[in-house]
């Protein structure tokens, strides 16, 4: 059933003007990510430059300045580098923590990982749940770990970093498990008793990008429905981040159509069509979006070397 509903969103016809607006919106929702063993301060700085100015030739070729992306996502050891480079830019610094990507480290080690990243300047923390505990039915344990992680996002000034809870849906085996994990994560974040964010909110996220399958439309639809039902119950907005496997502009537009038709009719439905509450975790997507924008504006495709790889 979810497969059929998700497939229906790929059949919508989008007008050219709406498509261009959608591409720019999708660009503003990208979390540029590098999570490799060979990451370095130099690579992180390149990622930051790309995040602030996705295409350095935009004004020359398009006669307009394209939006920055939403965030860069790095390991905790590179948070301070990115925080310094992005200060005042509006681009957020996100960091994976909690024993990414396995989630199998002792809880106190994972919480210390979060606190260090927040102190270093992280605006957002992408945590990963312990799938072994979840699949063994230890739901209270998983929920408590999410709650404790949310509390570890607190800053000394009374604010807190935003939290994205990665479910690693490719390891959850069934869509019923995806729904249960979504509900669990949303309620566990809410039970932390943290003050509301001034801008944006906390998220649930599909994947680490290290496991296949990563983000799929049926999985994302199930998670969006959990977000919708929580909103109808409480009035609280929770964000959504599909991550991994979204490589083309066409795919990104399909996801935005799904968000619009699933959440857009709610009283605050437009909120999910902003980077505050919807993100794409897909670095390779960025340049494909830029190529498509260039084609819509100029009638010609740019070569891959026209865009930096960060």
PLM segments and residue spans:
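A short, histidine- and acid-enriched strand-loop-helix "catalytic/donor-clamping" loop
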Residues: 35
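Charged, compositionally biased N-terminal leader segments and the immediate start
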Residues: 1-30
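Short, flexible loop segments at boundaries between secondary-structure elements
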Residues: 284-287
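Alpha/beta enzyme core
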Residues: 17-25, 38-67, 77-241, 247-277, ...
